[in-house]
Amino acid sequence: MSVFSRLRNGIPPSRDDCQSPYERLSQRMLDISGDRGVLKDIIREGAGDPVTPDASVLVKYSGYLEHMDKPFDSNCFRKTPRLMKLGEDITLWGMELGLLSMRRGELARFLFKPTYAYGTLGCPPLIPPNATVLFEIELIDFLDSAESDKFCALSAEQQEQFPLQKVLKVAATEREFGNYLFRQNRFCDAKVRYKRALLLLHRRLAICEEQHLVEPAELLVLLNLSFVYLKLDRPAMALRYGEQALLIDKRNAKALFRCGQACLLLTEYEQARDFLVRAQKEQPCNHDINNELKKLSSHYRDYVDREREMCHRMFAPCGSGSSVGGN
């Protein structure tokens, strides 16, 4: 059903009603700008805290001109919308104000007057002058990066002055960013975030009384780094971080599995088998581990067959016409 069909269904116009669809809709909307330049109608309530200034948001949106059923702008066709930072990636003032009023999971409809949208000139040929536009926005999630960005900009000496809980919070935020970028297949960017988190945690490991509090967070980041290096086709680095994770928890099934995967890619079959069998011992019913062991068995059989064929050729008796220099 189109936007304007919904408007008509929501507010049936009377015979003498000469108002436009946007004017009718605006009568039931909440003024969030103070001058009725940005109006809001909540379609589905969200939960938790509202978006914070300087946050990075994950949203789906569609923008409509009045009397038009098809959006002039939308990111709903994307499988995974990109993360956008307030104040940098979002250019519409109205959208920024609207997002600051939203909570996770919320779906809302907004009307933006020209001052909060495309101005008096519009954006030819797509947006006419003095256009009021309607946006439907769904806030999927947001990450508050302001605190993390400010903290990471400090020197190591300055960071050491903060309590451990602050460091753990910033490291967790960096890891969350990395996880989001990983889900978008932006593996190099994810790696940078994970390494930032690891650096913050390593600086606190020097304080002995904090080690037992830092290591659980460090373990998660090391597992992330091992996985992202597998995705980047760098198994040696994946093995390195996986082994560091095992120094914290030698029975961690995920770390053992990552090390096994890395060794298989490095064609270190005996090592791969050792890691994977240990992982299977921890999680006997894990399908990924069991499938990787089957994959290892297949690769090893192929390897043995190739070695046998090579040896056969090396030591096969020479034929009568195979001498060097023969015609």
From Swiss-Prot:
It is linked to Defects in Fkbp6 are the cause of spontaneous male sterile mutant 'As'. Males are sterile and aspermic due to abnormal pairing and misalignments between homologous chromosomes, non-homologous partner switches, and autosynapsis of X chromosome cores in meiotic spermatocytes. The gene is Fkbp6. Residues 1-20 are annotated as: Disordered. SMART domains: TPR. GO terms for molecular function: Hsp90 protein binding; identical protein binding. It is found in: Cytoplasm, Cytosol; Nucleus; Chromosome. The keyword Cell membrane does not apply. This is Inactive peptidyl-prolyl cis-trans isomerase FKBP6. Co-chaperone required during spermatogenesis to repress transposable elements and prevent their mobilization, which is essential for the germline integrity. Acts via the piRNA metabolic process, which mediates the repression of transposable elements during meiosis by forming complexes composed of piRNAs and Piwi proteins and govern the methylation and subsequent repression of transposons. Acts as a co-chaperone via its interaction with HSP90 and is required for the piRNA amplification process, the secondary piRNA biogenesis. TPR repeats lie at residues 171-204, 219-252, 253-286. One of its GO terms (biological process) is positive regulation of viral genome replication.
